[in-house]
């Protein structure tokens, strides 16, 4: 027993060394790192112009796939209708929602003109967190944007975005609910 204890402690130490850094990343640090991957895409001269739209959006989508949990976003959007969908319908809806978000965000991102992002706070509650930011325009106008994130393994993934306090997924949920109820 005494001979096993040092080995167990050594193993525990190794696990902490290799696992702790993944868990040590805060939601804000992870989101900031991901956003910092998108900004160079928008500034890249070889991706500018209408002829490069498809290529530019594919690069943005690749980063979005690292940041977003489209399945959780889809579940939120469908609300009570989610449980009545088959796995195949859920996967298809999540994919289509990802496409919708890509088009909506990509169009706005392509209008990027040197705005700054200020990270103003973070609230973590277990596996859920809110990352508070402000987008600051060149004119000094501040637009509050909060990201609702959840932990999946060692990553924090966005599942909702609140712009000036209004939930994007809540907005889609109201629209989809109306469509589903009338069809």
Question: Would you name each region that the model predicts?
Answer:
Residues 11-12, 22:
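Cleavable N-terminal signal peptides
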Residues 1-10:
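Bacterial N-terminal signal peptides that target proteins for export
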Residues 103-143:
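Surface-exposed, charged secondary-structure patches
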Residues 167, 171-183:
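Non-transmembrane domains of secretory- and envelope-associated proteins
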Residues 26-105:
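Early exported N-terminus immediately downstream of N-terminal targeting peptides
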Residues 18-24:
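Sec/Tat signal peptide C-region and signal peptidase I cleavage site
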Residues 142-170:
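Short beta-strand edge/turn micro-motifs at domain boundaries
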Residues 44-51, 55, 84-91, 111-114, ...:
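Surface-exposed, polar/charged faces of alpha-helical domains
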